[in-house]
């Protein structure tokens, strides 16, 4: 898809840019429509789902998780549902209600306490330092969740910048590292 100032004047058609942007938005929305939003929609990951649901029900969870597996198995979806369950005002049976403002904000990608970070694109030390700094800003709700997608893409200096936050996290902070290459995650994590 074309975007930016170059698309505005393609073949002298200023509306082309608007049509392409509308199509891109429609594809993004379609993608999110079919992404699972609650535990019952996750298929083939019953063991992981049961463990995370039980932790939410007991209100006793770890501060860091590595969700590893091939592309398309649901790592990021599981992390998002877990984040929704941890931040949901009306969570029941270890899962998010899907209706409160917190749940809706997660689905739209605009939750104030759930930060999704693409490590494949933002893999450097400066970005990691900013994540670590923001980790100590308290949450507005019961938990703050960092979902690090493609975590294997982080550089060694970036992991070093996150290490102190991982070793001594604030009590409200949960990390979910999603990766297709768990061997690339440092052993110290």
Task: Label every PLM stretch briefly.
Residues 2-189:
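P-loop/Walker A NTP-binding region and its immediately flanking N-terminal helices
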């Amino acid at each position: 898809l074309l975007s930016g100032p170059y698309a505005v004047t393609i073949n002298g058609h200023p509306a082309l840019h608007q049509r392409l942007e509308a199509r891109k938005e429609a594809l993004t929305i379609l993608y999110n429509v079919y992404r699972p939003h609650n535990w019952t929609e996750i298929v083939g990951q019953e063991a992981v789902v049961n463990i995370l649901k039980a932790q939410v029900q007991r209100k006793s969870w770890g501060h860091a998780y590595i969700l590893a597996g091939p592309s398309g198995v649901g790592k990021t979806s599981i992390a998002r549902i877990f984040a929704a369950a941890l931040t949901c005002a009306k969570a029941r049976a270890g899962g998010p209600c899907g209706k409160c403002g917190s749940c809706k904000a997660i689905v739209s990608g605009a939750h104030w306490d759930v930060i999704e970070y693409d490590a494949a694109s933002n893999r450097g030390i400066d970005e990691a330092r900013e994540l670590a700094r923001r980790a100590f800003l308290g949450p507005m709700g019961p938990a703050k969740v960092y979902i690090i997608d493609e975590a294997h893409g982080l550089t060694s200096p970036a992991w070093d910048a996150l290490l102190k936050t991982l070793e001594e996290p604030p009590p409200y902070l949960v990390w979910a590292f999603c990766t297709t290459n768990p061997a690339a995650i440092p052993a110290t994590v």
